[in-house]
Swiss-Prot record:
Protein name, per record: Gamma-glutamyl phosphate reductase
This protein's GO CC annotations: cytoplasm
InterPro entries, A to Z: Ald_DH/histidinol_DH, Ald_DH_C, Ald_DH_N, Aldehyde_DH_dom, G-glutamylP_reductase_CS, Glu-5-SA_DH, GPR_dom
The encoding gene: proA
Primary enzyme class: oxidoreductase
Gene3D superfamilies reported in the protein's UniProt record: Aldehyde Dehydrogenase, Chain A, domain 1, Aldehyde Dehydrogenase, Chain A, domain 2
Length: 421
């Protein structure tokens, strides 16, 4: 690359800004045509995708990437199938752009409503998973946003191969190539440039490790949609149905360990602990989950439960490790969650309607649940289609961010020669 990284990123930004204006007025049928053509291009380019991905995997093995990272990096035939299906699914989703709602007349006689519009240009910064390229590009395209995608250097060849398929889809639909751009330099200065261009980029969505997200949150000069941690809780109330409690607490921890909506701390009311914890501990031990507990939990379950420290209550393990605390009641459970949680997803298991309503009202998280596993905190499960990420922020988008989270609203006003007096 002969131009400087800053000049290169500025060029991408200018092109994306110009493309965003065209995308904002693109017809739904045209956007869907691009998505479906990109899906067909991916299907036809399976050999090319596999070859590019093998280059990344070989480099990753040579550089000592951990097996878990290599697994996330791999584009298996099944994952290519999922990417193709993902594009086709997004094409079937309702287009939010241009929708006008809440139309009403006001005393002056004018009619006022709100129109849903794209954000503009979305910068996506992510690590490892090449499939994020498809998730992000498809949602941004359908919602009328241009996007600049900066994937991890370990996936550069895979991302470029995927981008070529997306570009083919854009071309077939008559949409600008700059609607979806993949950063082709692995220079880390590109990240700093991308998050520092408010004249070109309207929002940044980081997906990756805590260090990356903290850096972007600290240094970005444009708004950021993010979540730092997934410290999710399940609280088993004294009025819980025991079968439901065991089923949910098992699933919330052991269905998968790595996702950000996996339970990391189990809270149990002292009045039900002797009935709920022993059978749960048996399940966890059979599945190889390491248990850490407070003094009451260790006294009940035995010495093989490790002592939970203050740090455990604040830790997202992403591993078969679970912290357990026995609490005196709902007040203590809510206090624990609001003190140690990450405002991601928390659940109560109870048959007491008043306790459920209090939990929903007082737990300060993006998703709060009653008698359901935290693993449901996902755009697909919420009926949003794909998601671009999960936000624990309180401004703009909160929770799983799908198409609507990539839009904003503007007021539209209709009059008939009205003037203000």
């Amino acid at each position: 690359m002969t131009e400087s990284v800053l000049d290169y990123m500025s060029r991408l930004g200018r092109d994306a800004r110009a493309a965003s204006r065209l995308l904002a007025r693109a017809a739904t049928a045209q956007k869907n045509r691009a998505l479906l053509a990109a899906a067909d291009a991916l299907d036809a380019a399976r050999a090319e995708l596999s070859h590019a991905n093998e280059q990344d995997l070989a480099a990753g093995r040579a550089n000592g990437l951990e097996p878990a990272m290599l697994d996330r990096l791999a584009l298996t035939p099944a994952r290519i199938d999922d990417m193709i299906e993902g594009l086709r699914q997004v094409a079937t989703l309702p287009d939010p752009i241009g929708e006008i709602r809440d139309m009403r007349y006001v005393p002056s006689g004018i009619q006022i409503g709100k129109m849903r519009v794209p954000l503009g240009v979305v910068g996506i910064i992510y690590e490892s998973r090449p499939n994020v390229t498809i998730d992000a590009a498809s949602l941004c395209l359908k919602s009328g946003n241009a996007t600049i995608l900066r994937g991890g250097s370990e996936a550069i060849h895979s991302n470029q191969a995927i981008a070529r398929c997306i570009q083919q889809g854009l071309a077939e639909a008559g949409l600008p190539a700059a609607a979806v751009q993949v950063v082709e330099t692995t220079d880390r200065a590109a990240v700093g440039a991308l998050i520092s261009m408010p004249e070109y980029v309207d929002v940044i969505v980081p997906r990756g490790g805590k260090g990356l997200i903290e850096r972007i949150s600290r240094e970005a000069k444009v708004p950021v949609i993010k979540h730092l941690d997934g410290i999710c809780h399940v609280y088993i109330d004294v009025a819980a149905d025991l079968d439901k409690a065991i089923r949910v607490a098992d699933n919330a921890k052991t269905q998968r360990y790595a996702p950000c909506n996996t339970m990391e701390t189990l809270l149990v009311h002292a009045g039900i602990a002797e009935r709920a914890l022993p059978p749960l501990a048996t399940i966890y031990r059979e599945k190889g989950v390491e248990l850490r507990g407070d003094a009451a939990t260790r006294a009940l379950l035995g010495a093989d439960v490790l002592e939970a420290t203050e740090e455990d209550w604040r830790t997202e393990y992403n591993a078969p490790i679970l912290s357990i605390r026995i609490v005196d009641g709902l007040d203590a459970a809510i206090e624990h969650i609001n003190t140690y949680g990450s405002q991601h997803t928390d659940a109560i298991i109870t048959e007491n309607f008043s306790d459920a309503r209090r939990f929903l009202a007082e737990v300060d998280s993006a998703s709060v649940m009653v008698n359901a596993s935290t693993r449901f905190a996902d755009g697909f499960e919420y009926g949003l289609g794909a998601e671009i990420g999960i936000s624990t922020d309180k401004l703009h988008a909160r929770g799983p961010v799908g198409l609507e989270g990539l839009t904003s609203e503007k007021y539209v006003v209709f009059g008939d020669g009205h003037v203000r007096t």
